Curated annotation (Swiss-Prot):
Phylogenetic lineage: Eukaryota, Metazoa, Chordata, Craniata, Vertebrata
Record-linked InterPro entries: Kunitz_BPTI (IPR002223), Kunitz_BPTI_sf (IPR036880), Prtase_inh_Kunz-CS (IPR020901), TFPI/VKTCI-like (IPR050098)
Function summary: Serine protease inhibitor.
Protein name in the entry: Kunitz-type serine protease inhibitor ki-VN
Localization, UniProt: Secreted
């Protein structure tokens, strides 16, 4: 196979990996943890995955402790934890 063909194949595989949705069995276990604001008093708008609604929701993180179900953007939460059996998940905004 030519180097151009290999490059095309690599590009297609990369695109496929980016667009493939997370299935519930592939979802990291920390996605099932509840929102945990932590013990400190900072005001850091963050997002957590709510497994009951299969959506990322906003919460206020206090800045320390907490758990791994804590994302700076909705987009990061969505691509890590949201699952759908209906095909490709579109990218969403960060707010």
């Amino acid at each position: 196979m030519s180097s151009g063909g290999l490059l095309l194949l690599l590009g297609l595989l990369t695109l496929w990996a980016e667009l493939t949705p997370v299935s519930s069995r592939d979802r990291p276990k920390f996605c099932y943890l509840p929102a945990e604001p932590g013990e400190c008093n900072a005001y850091m708008p963050s997002f957590y995955y709510d497994s009951a609604s299969n959506k990322c929701k906003k919460f206020i993180y206090g800045g320390c402790r907490g758990n791994a179900n804590n994302f700076k953007t909705r987009d990061e939460c969505h691509h890590t934890c949201v699952a759908s059996g209906k095909g490709i998940q579109p990218r969403i905004g960060s707010n």
